């Protein structure tokens, strides 16, 4: 286990999480910000990328597990993401649709912010969010983040405007 909150724990994903990950990444509505659902090969590539991030950085997107049922309901964690000419430490999150609007993403994202500041000793952490993804924007705001920049990213053959949210360690009480 990497992190624990009141209702959740976050741990590294492993191959046995493939089916749970499919419930997220193969769902059209969940993946609208990515221009569509993934297929099995893309889900496997995503999982492999997280596992290699754990080895390279010591962090990545982690499985979010509901304590009450021991079920993986989403993913949330820290990744290094390209933004214009640099790489940013980003809090990312994506949950099964069944668990939307219950505060789980905010709870997990706040724990990741604390981890970034206290364990990784980061001075700032970001969330890069598509301009049409209102629910994720609300999570970022609840995590004390503000928009600092915008940029059009090219992904899956589509130009997508993204906003860059930031929170700085010196601005928050941990």
Q: Can you say where each PLM-predicted feature lies in the sequence?
A:
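Short amphipathic alpha-helix in the helical subdomain of ABC transporter nucleotide-binding domains
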Residues: 40-43
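Acyl-donor (CoA/ACP) binding surface of acyl/acetyltransferases
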Residues: 1-32, 48, 65-174
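A short helix-loop-beta-strand connector motif used in the catalytic cores of GNAT acetyltransferases and
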Residues: 50-63
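Conserved alpha-helical substructure of the radical SAM core
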Residues: 34-37
């Amino acid at each position: 286990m990497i992190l624990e909150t009141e209702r959740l724990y976050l741990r590294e994903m492993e191959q046995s999480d493939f089916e749970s990950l499919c419930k997220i990444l193969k769902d059209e509505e969940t993946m609208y910000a990515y221009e569509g659902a993934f297929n099995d090969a893309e889900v496997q590539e995503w999982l492999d990328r997280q596992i290699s991030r754990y080895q390279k950085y010591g962090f990545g997107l982690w499985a979010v597990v509901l304590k009450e049922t021991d079920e993986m309901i989403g993913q949330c964690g820290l990744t290094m993401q390209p933004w214009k000419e640099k790489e940013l430490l980003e809090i990312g999150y994506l949950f099964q649709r069944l668990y939307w609007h219950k505060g789980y993403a905010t709870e997990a994202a706040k724990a990741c912010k604390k981890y970034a500041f206290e364990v990784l000793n980061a001075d700032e952490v970001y969330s890069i969010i598509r301009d049409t993804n209102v629910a994720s924007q609300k999570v970022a705001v609840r995590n004390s983040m503000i928009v600092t920049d915008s940029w059009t990213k090219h992904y899956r053959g589509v130009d997508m405007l993204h906003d860059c949210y930031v929170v700085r360690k010196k601005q928050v009480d941990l």
